[in-house]
Amino acid sequence: MIAKKITFSNGLECYYSSSKEETEYIFSEIFTERQYEGHDIVIKEGDVIFDVGANIGLFSIFVKGVEPTAKVFAFEPIKPTFEVLQKNIHLHSLEDVVLFNCGLSSENNPAKIFTFYPNMSANSTTKPEDTLAELEDIQVDQNFPKIENLFEEFFQEKEQVACEVRTLSSVINELGIDSIDLLKIDVEGEEYEVFQGIEAKDWPKIKQIVAEIHDKKGRLKQISQMLADNGFKIQLEKRELLPSTFVDIFHLYAVR
């Protein structure tokens, strides 16, 4: 895939390889709407941040802009997307950003199957049924007149790719991590499995969590209970302005 460069409204430059529309949408979520801030989430000097589902690196870039002394560990399993992530970290000469070409899940698996959407790379997933209705079953919401064209143009091209996944606890063990000040998770339906990969001894090391939760099969309730059982106070915010064909998606904010 050929990486292109975009300049956003705030002057920030970055490389991307999927659609310009998706890249601008992610920028808006992170930099304009600042969806990973607020709700008692705080990024402080010297914090250790885990960016799980890093995509092309916009959240990692955002974190380093907010707090240059933060240390970021960024995880992206899809190889073509990971290569763009590398280019963006190099473009901005970011220090203390450690990149991993793997995802996080409930097990260590060198070849977990993902559905990769080259034109919508941030939607690549192990659970494509969570994110999209079948194209032929789409019922277009009146507020989204262009959605059919977007589905046709951006989601029809897809491929199955084998990617490495690891448990969060295996990474904590390998790196000797004592504290994760913020755990950010955006993994397109795999979030419950990410939490399952945390051993009991490692939960106290995690101080704050921001996660996008795809609420299917009671997943939101399961995750909320798991976090409450491990000492977190939780706030939820439902994402609006999504077509009715998408599963309900929430932003979850958890602090101790």
Question: Model-derived features: where do they sit?
Answer:
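Phosphate/nucleotide-binding beta-alpha loop and adjacent structural elements of enzyme active sites
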Residues: 1-256
